[in-house]
Each structure stands twice: as structure tokens, then as C-alpha cells.
Amino acid sequence: MRLASQSAILVKVWTWNASRNAWKASGGIFDIPQKETRLKELERRLEDPSLWNDPEAARKVSQEAARLRRTVDTFRSLESDLQGLLELMEELPAEEREALKPELEEAAKKLDELYHQTLLNFPHAEKNAILTIQPGAGGTEACDWAEMLLRMYTRFAERQGFQVEVVDLTPGPEAGIDYAQILVKGENAYGLLSPEAGVHRLVRPSPFDASGRRHTSFAGVEVIPEVDEEVEVVLKPEELRIDVMRASGPGGQGVNTTDSAVRVVHLPTGITVTCQTTRSQIKNKELALKILKARLYELERKKREEELKALRGEVRPIEWGSQIRSYVLDKNYVKDHRTGLMRHDPENVLDGDLMDLIWAGLEWKAGRRQGTEEVEAE
């Protein structure tokens, strides 16, 4: 079948058609068979009345099931629609196929949306985002650049229908900002903003230089997910082994020789707490459980700290050689050094038009896009 050369949409759909058998065999980038298996497992859990004894666990299971159901249903519907369109195209003469362009464009749009969902399939992607901006090398120019980035991300959030809450803001000594932290609220806010973390470089004739000379300045952006503040520790009876034994200690009239000492073992972690402080077995048990909860709390807190450290990624100095993206205003371009993507409309980028840069960054993070981190001298 000859493709209509004027319709890039047909190329996209036929690319899908040529590879769909491989997708069915392996699950492809969409991993639909795996998602369907996981969805069935979650639906079985939701039917278990005991799950609802823990409202927070039930909420998380419900949310995951809803996301998976949305992806699976969209894929199956799209698969059916595309199959029908492709069969119809096979039957039509070449000159009549262009009439299907609106339907093909809609199918291609849905295909893109589904593909983008696969790029947001990582921990905490669905959560709100905490975004922090700090100026680096460049003095007043860098402080102004940090404020420009703050506006850029605020405009991006507005374009996506997200809410922005200023958490902390410190003005610069002369202009701009010395520090800013905002909370971006919306579905997938963290997922979308996560590839923006890193050092951003600005090159322009400086408005703070009376001679109008070209200046280079830097600002660092950190993006982390908003997570639950409280570390909740739930002691499940089936995860505990409680032993009662005779208290031990130095001899004497006041020695506790009753079977009041209590040892509590937390089976999943192996943490053991023994308490023989009082002659009351009940009080010793209560104290042992309190100590166990405290130790589990600390264990979970450290785990979250390590997870947050991993999410922050490598901390690079906010200076030359560390940048992920350059905004060169006098030469009218923005270049992402990880993905190689270049834009020639920096005014739109700085007004929050970031989606192509973000999708490219997510592809790069997922290992689906090759770029270069080489930075040319300006």
C-alpha cells in the first residue's frame, strides 16, 4: 500500500501496524498483559472486606487499580479502533485514503497520550511536586535568572491546570531571588517536572551591565515528590512473636523473680525488644511495644531519607559543565544537552511551553532517547 506523502499521521499508524504483532508477543512498551495481571490482583484485593479495615491501604489500592484500568481500557479501545481503520485503508483506493485523516489524527493523538503514560510509570510520578530554585555562579544576573525560572515553572503549572503554592521565597540582594520553593499540586506534577531537575544555564546580554556585555549565569532546580509527612507504624499481631519469661537481674530482696519479662520479636525485620522494667507483665509488654514502634519508625524514616536522596539524584555544582540545558537568548535557541532537543523560540519556553522538552527528558530518563551532554562554548 502506498502512503499519502502529505500525511505523516499515516506513517505513524503504519509504523504501529508493522510492529503490533511484536507488541502482542512481548507486551511492548505498554506492558499491557502485565498490567492486566496486576489489575486482576488488585481487584481481588478490593473484594476482600479486610482491606477496608485499613482506609489508607484501601485508598492506595483503589488509586492504582483506577490508573491501570484507565490505561488498559484506553489501549484495548485504541487497538480496536486502529485495527478497523487499517482494514478500511486496505480497501480504499489511495486517492480516497486522505478522507480518513481526521480519524487517524485522533487515533495518533490517543497513541501519543498512551505512550506518554508509559513514561510516567515510576514511583511517586502521580504525586504533587516540591520544586526548589537556587541561583549559582553569576551574582545578580544569576538571581535574576532564578526568578525567570520561577516564572517559567509557574506558567508551566498554570498551562497544565496545576495549582502553585509558594512555600518559601527569599529576594536577591539587588534583584531577582536568592531562593524559592514552590509546591505544585496536580495529577502527575512530580512525574512531569522530574526531568527538570538539574543546572540551567542562561546566556544573554545582561540588563545589569551598562555596556550590555554578554553574561553567563546558572541556577539549580531540585524536584522531589510531596510525600506523607507522618511515618505511620502499624504493629500487626501476625507479625509479632511475644514471649514471656522470668525476669533476670542481680539477687536481693527486691529482685523481680516473677514471669513478667516480655520479649517482642518483629518477624519481618527481626527487631527484638526485651523489657523487664516492672513486675507487671502488662506494663512490660506495653513498654516493649512502644520501643518496637519507635525503632520501626526510625527504620522507616531512614528508608524514606534514602529514597528521597535517590530521587534528588546526583548533586552537581551550579556552575559551568554541570548544566542540563542552555538558554542562549541572543542566538535565539534553547538546547537540552541530555536529549539533544533544540528549540528556536526561547520566549515561548520561558513562558512555560515545556511539554516537548519534558517528554524528551522523560524518554531520556527511561533510556528510550539518546542525547549528548557535551556543551559547546558560546
From Swiss-Prot:
GO terms for cellular component: cytoplasm. SMART domains: PCRF. GO terms for molecular function: rRNA binding; translation release factor activity, codon specific; tRNA binding. Pfam families: PCRF (PF03462), RF-1 (PF00472). Keywords: Cytoplasm, Methylation, Protein biosynthesis, RNA-binding, rRNA-binding, tRNA-binding. Interacts with the ribosome. Interacts with ribosomal protein L11. Recruited to stalled E.coli ribosomes by E.coli ArfA. This is Peptide chain release factor RF2. The gene is prfB.
